[in-house]
């Protein structure tokens, strides 16, 4: 092997190693096979033990970029506070997953529109399976936000979404 080819091979190997490391960091492919289960208790409407929260709106997830299922419920708590409850959620794990309320409608085939209008980020997804609660900020007009989505911020993609239907 000539001396001029050795540096080229070392540089090529270094570029491949760096590209692989960056790709692993960005895409986190191991998250496709990991599960993070959460089982939070439902919030109580009052300080009285056993009191139930009042349901304001409900919906069921449909799949977008990844298979997603489960139900959502907006619940009225003591003092006018509201919470979003995800029940029996099942979706893929992924990088930078958040729970959003969106003012955009749910589309069956694609959730790419859900970041087009206004949205409220309720926080990072606590787990890709199970039951979990998210506080809805005070002053949120739930008539303007009719969709819940599991949103991947890194890839600007909806894993799944649910249309909120107001309860009478």
What is each model feature region?
Residues 109-137:
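An anionic, turn-rich surface loop/hairpin at beta-sheet edges
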Residues 9-25:
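Hydrophobic membrane-insertion alpha-helices, especially the h-region
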Residues 163-168:
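Extracytoplasmic/periplasmic copper-protein system
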Residues 98-100:
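Beta-strand signatures of extracellular beta-sandwich domains
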Residues 137-160:
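Short, exposed beta-strand-loop hairpins at the edges of beta-sheets
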Residues 1-6:
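Terminal targeting segments of Actinobacterial cell-envelope proteins
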Residues 25-80, 114-117:
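Transition segment at domain starts
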Residues 71-72, 82-87, 132-136:
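N-terminal post-signal-peptidase region of extra-cytosolic proteins
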């Amino acid at each position: 092997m000539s001396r001029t080819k050795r540096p080229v091979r070392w540089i090529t190997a270094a570029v491949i190693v760096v590209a692989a490391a960056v790709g692993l960091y960005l895409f986190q492919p191991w998250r496709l096979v990991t599960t993070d289960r959460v089982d939070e208790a439902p919030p109580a409407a009052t300080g009285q033990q056993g009191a139930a929260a009042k349901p304001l709106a409900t919906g069921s997830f449909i799949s977008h970029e990844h298979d997603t299922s489960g139900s959502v419920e907006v619940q009225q708590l003591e003092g006018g506070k509201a919470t979003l409850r995800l029940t029996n959620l099942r979706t893929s794990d992924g990088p930078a997953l958040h729970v959003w309320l969106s003012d955009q409608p749910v589309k069956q085939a694609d959730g790419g529109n859900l970041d087009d209008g206004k949205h409220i980020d309720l926080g990072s997804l606590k787990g890709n399976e199970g039951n979990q609660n998210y506080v809805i900020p005070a002053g949120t007009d739930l008539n303007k936000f009719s969709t819940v989505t599991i949103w991947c911020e890194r890839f600007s993609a909806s894993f799944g979404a649910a249309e909120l239907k107001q309860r009478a």
